[in-house]
Amino acid sequence: QRSKFEKDARRLVSILFSKSPFKERKQDFNVWGLCPESREPGISRPSTGIHRRSRIGATYDAFGSERYVLTFDNRSFRDVASFAPYEFVEILVNGNTYGGGGIFGLYSTVAADSLWSPYVFVHEFGHHFAGLADEYYTSDSAYLPTADRLEPWEPNVTALKDPKQLKWKALLSPDTPLPTPWRKDEFEADSRAIQTERKKIRADRRPESEMDALFTREKTEVSRILGTDQYSGKVGAFEGAMYEPRGYFRPEEDCIMFTRDEVPFCRVCQAALSRIIDLYARGPEK
């Protein structure tokens, strides 16, 4: 299946380089593709009784999340990666079930045959490449909620303890209030219905096409809700981020790190990504 891997890799890399700031900085990247042979095709998904002997041990259901794809076999992963010079790694897994994962400074993953692989590839690479936080908060995550709202280290979320010291204040749009109002209640009501149906699809082990249809409907509804407010497209501090509906804020109403909508990285995320590109392409600032 080497030819399939090459087609998938070229397709997904081209999508990454269609997004800013990668689009403008494509010349600063070298991309290598490695296609190690596996004993069996496909990827493990223990929650549905599927187990595969893959070369690097990638699997769904990481940390109990059915969509979270990781490998815990670091030695095998590093053995494969050592055949090319690398700073960043994206692992393509041979599956069509929605899923992926991204860990800052380690690797990111995506199910290459999923309808949503273009989005997941870019979103998860944002985690891996620049330590971007998840801005969504209405779907289940593999992490426990926090009792305290400490200021996160990630560049694109804040606890907004002191609006005057907002970490992205240099990008703040003029005359934008903090916190910044948006159609939060309407968004959450819609999301609750979607998440209920999402869980039922997985519990009933229904075809992946039904999940794809649900996500497509969600995308239409969310695009209708977002993007039409007074502060849509503005940089502010919109409550709801990092798996929490209260107490954490994101820079813009919508972003690749928030929804599957047809939107770019927000300006704060773009700035964070650009800093990492500069670090590797130009060296540290003196």
Language-model segments: what does each one mean?
Residues 1-79, 112:
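Propeptide-to-catalytic entry region of secreted or membrane-anchored zinc metalloproteases
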Residues 2-5, 100-125:
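Short pre-active-site segment immediately N-terminal to the catalytic Zn-binding motif
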Residues 23-26, 81-86, 103, 229-230, ...:
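Extracellular/periplasmic catalytic domains that process cell-envelope and extracellular macromolecules
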Residues 30-33, 88-92, 120-121, 127-131, ...:
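Structural recognition of the beta-strand scaffold that forms the well-ordered cores
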Residues 37-41, 95-99, 115-117, 135-136, ...:
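Solvent-exposed loop/turn segments at secondary-structure junctions
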Residues 42-45, 74-111:
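Catalytic zinc-binding patch centered on the HExxH motif and its immediate surroundings
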Residues 125-141:
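Catalytic Zn2+-binding segment of zinc metalloproteases
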